[in-house]
Amino acid sequence: MKTFHGPTFGTAVFLYLLLFLTSALEEGEITSKVKFPPSSSPSFPRLVMVGTLPDLQEITLCYWFKVNHLKSTLTIFSYNTAKNDNELLTSLEKQGAFHMNVHGAPQLKVQCPNKIHIGKWHHVCHTWSSWEGEATIGVDGFHCKGNATGIAMGVTLSQGGLVVLGQEQDSVGGEYDAEQSLEGELSELNLWNTVLNHEQIKHLSKCAHPSERHIHGNIIQWDKTQFQAYDGVVLSPNEICA
């Protein structure tokens, strides 16, 4: 396994998320993980995507994450535009319920059958379609209770905004809150401009053969999309399924 020396505290560097991760183990493919240390003003550990998203009328957002502490609301994915500070937002509250905001519409809040365990990797997928406003959240391959229709129905998510991982933006690229930050680890975050079916999502959530488990995002692809790291975020090898 190759060693990666991540960004130091207070620096910003470009991360190419799979420069050194090309081999595989029998028990699970080696991939990259990003560690977010605790936030405290003025330090807000985060990844900021280089570039923006296109207009979107359907999405699937999937990722693996591990929580170190669950004392308050944890923000995983925040996409803001000049017109809307919650164009797309996903988070986990301390009671264990997942939230998804789309285009500032009333948020989807669901309680999932699989409890989130501190220090354990979990796989999460969010889907949304503008056509009927159908939104779902699933954890570890299982649908959560409370999936709904009528969420931002007929809406198009606008291009031109900023994607931030690990912090919630209250303005584009700013106004972060330490009480809404991720303290933990994140891996294999991918975004598609379509809704994946249940079987595809189940494959992504399992420690299966890489050809079955990995369906790479066509909007954000973890091993190719470029990010900047701030305030002590560290990239290292990771074996999710080991």
Curated annotation (Swiss-Prot):
Listed GO MF terms: metal ion binding
Glycosylation sites per record: N147
Chain residues that bind phosphocholine: T60, Y63
Record's keyword terms, sorted: Calcium, Disulfide bond, Glycoprotein, Metal-binding, Secreted, Signal
First and last residue of the signal peptide: 1-24
Keyword Glycoprotein: yes
Cofactor binding: number and manner: Binds 2 calcium ions per subunit.
Sequence positions that bind Ca(2+) 1: D85, N86, E168, Q169, D170
Pentraxin (PTX) domain span: 30-241
Main location: secreted
Family matches, as InterPro entries: ConA-like_dom_sf, Neuronal_Pentraxin_Related, Pentaxin_CS, Pentraxin-related
Binding-site list for Ca(2+) 2: E168, D170, Q180
Any one GO cellular component localisation term in the record: extracellular region
SUPFAM superfamilies: Concanavalin A-like lectins/glucanases
Pfam annotation, one family: Pentaxin
Quaternary structure note: Homopentamer. Pentraxin (or pentaxin) have a discoid arrangement of 5 non-covalently bound subunits.
Protein name: C-reactive protein 1.4
The species this protein was found in: Limulus polyphemus (Atlantic horseshoe crab)
